Amino acid sequence: MMGDADNDIDTEPRGRLVIVGTGITGVSQLTLEAVGWIEAADVVCYVLADPLTERWIHEHARSTEDLARLHQSGVPRVHAYRAMSERLVEHARSGRLVVGVFYGHPGVFTSPSHWAVEAARAEGISARMLPAVSAEDCLFAGLGIDPGDGACQSFEATDMLIRARVPATDAHLVIWQVGVVAQMGLQTGDGHLGALVQYLLRFYPATHLVTHYQAAQSVVADPTIHPVPLGELGTLTLAVTSTLYVPPLAARDYDMAIAASIDLGGATAEPSDASAVAVDWYRPMPEGPSRLGALITSLSTDPSLLDAVRADPRPYLLAVGLDVIEAWAFLVRDQRWINACIREGSGPAAAVALGAAATQEEARSFFVHTDGRLVRRAKRPLPSPDTVSTSPA
């Protein structure tokens, strides 16, 4: 709306959309940040896989809406997903803080969350997605797999088939949604699992041991870990939450010429069993509280406080008693200085640890210049952020 100079602003309601995930076991894998948003929301819209998490949300949210009601039997899931995303944006359009809660990681095999964030941003509505624990994260932990040990590839079962994706047999392979191959609706069952098995047999022998994996759905349950020869995989009864892990047939050799060209010619050997050698820069975390650490912890779990501090941080920095260096680090968002202040417990101690001052007494003379720089009263200039040591003190 347009009016006089004092009212020449957009008065249309502007809501906000935040998407969070519950992880796989629900309540136990909710992050503190996600809990803070759920409790702060005007309305929480959810699609969940267990009644415990649903009950927890009803107990902690001001208002709730179950988006699973938009599913219709016999109708392609994509139609329900579109309706879910539109419902989330509809709430935000009305000026509300709406939190969408999805099972697992909200951005992994969850189309409505991505569509809602994209649509909201296109309309000028603030929208963001927070990370959460996914089924693959649980698989790595449950099977003891490090995706950084060699390489790891991740395919969706139906997509792998219809696009004829070729796996690298010298890398870990994770195949999602093996229990619902080629199923577009809400029906469950093994579907076309046999077709997936036959496709994989083009690349792996029938005797190759694979693992059918299902993450535990609650803290009182155990995961399903069922090793089986690939040729016998079709005899298993799978579920919507089933994931398949296929280990590499063999490790890939190093390209020694490339390794040598990037100065890694001698770094390709397997690690030895030698005892760890103490490093001279390490020292334990100092005892005692951190004012800056306590403030940032509070901001991590209280969205309302975070909004207020972002709008005008100075009153809050004064209220919690930050020293000049702590306040400066927070205001300029210099993560190296923030980390040092939290670790050392104060700004002057952080300045000494980072090599910006010889003593804490010297650091206490620092002040913030009118141009926003942290300066000392002595003649010796402070090192620039690019030259301050980042090694632990």
Where are these regions (language model features)?
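Phosphate- and divalent-cation-binding pockets in alpha/beta enzyme and binding domains
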Residues: 52-56, 138-139, 308
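Alpha-helix N-cap/helix-start capping motif
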Residues: 114, 133-134, 303
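Beta-strand/loop-alpha-helix module characteristic of Rossmann-like adenine-cofactor folds
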Residues: 2-20, 37, 43, 93, ...
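Short phosphate-binding/catalytic loops that engage adenosine nucleotides
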Residues: 96, 125, 205, 304, ...
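Class I S-adenosyl-L-methionine
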Residues: 2-28, 32-130, 242-243, 265-285, ...
